From Swiss-Prot:
The gene is SAA1. It is found in: Secreted. One of its GO terms (cellular component) is high-density lipoprotein particle. It is linked to Reactive, secondary amyloidosis is characterized by the extracellular accumulation in various tissues of the SAA protein. These deposits are highly insoluble and resistant to proteolysis; they disrupt tissue structure and compromise function. PANTHER family: SERUM AMYLOID A, SERUM AMYLOID A PROTEIN. Belongs to the SAA family. PROSITE patterns: SAA (PS00992). This is Serum amyloid A protein. Keywords: Acute phase, Amyloid, HDL, Pyrrolidone carboxylic acid, Secreted, Signal. Residues 112-129 form a propeptide. Expressed by the liver; secreted in plasma. Major acute phase reactant. Apolipoprotein of the HDL complex. Disulfide bonds: none annotated.
Length: 129
C-alpha cells in the first residue's frame, strides 16, 4: 500500500512539474515574441503602426499557450504602466497619454484573444512585418 501511495504521489508531482515546465517554456517563448514585435516596431519606424505591433506581439505570444498569454499580459501591462509614470515627467507630445494607453491596451487584448492583428495594420507598412 505504501508503494502504491508513493507511486501515485510521485506521478502527481511529476505531472504538476511538467505542467509548470511547459508553462514556463511558453512564457519564455511568448516574451521572445513580444521582444520581436517591439524590435520590428522600432526597425519599421512607421507612423501609425504602433497598435499593429502591439496586437501582433500579443497574438504571437498567446498562440504559444497559457504561459505565452500570461507573459504577454504581464509585459503589456508593465509597459503601459511605465508609460503612465513617464507621463508625469514628460509633457506635450510624448504620445503616451491616457487615450493612447487605452488604445494600446485594446490592441493588446485584441491580439491576446486570438483576433487577427492585421486589423490594426496601416496601409503601406512593408510586407516584411
Amino acid at each position: 500500500m505504501k508503494l502504491f501511495t508513493g507511486l501515485v504521489f510521485c506521478s502527481l508531482v511529476l505531472g504538476v512539474s511538467s505542467q509548470w515546465y511547459s508553462f514556463l517554456g511558453e512564457a519564455a517563448q511568448g516574451a521572445w515574441d513580444m521582444w520581436r514585435a517591439y524590435s520590428d516596431m522600432r526597425e519599421a519606424n512607421y507612423i501609425g503602426a504602433d497598435k499593429y505591433f502591439h496586437a501582433r506581439g500579443n497574438y504571437d505570444a498567446a498562440q504559444r499557450g497559457p504561459g505565452g498569454a500570461w507573459a504577454a499580459k504581464v509585459i503589456s501591462d508593465a509597459r503601459e504602466n511605465s508609460q503612465r509614470v513617464t507621463d508625469f515627467f514628460r509633457h506635450g507630445n510624448s504620445g503616451h497619454g491616457a487615450e493612447d494607453s487605452k488604445a494600446d491596451q485594446a490592441a493588446n487584448e485584441w491580439g491576446r484573444s486570438g483576433k487577427d492583428p492585421n486589423h490594426f495594420r496601416p496601409a503601406g507598412l512593408p510586407s516584411k512585418y
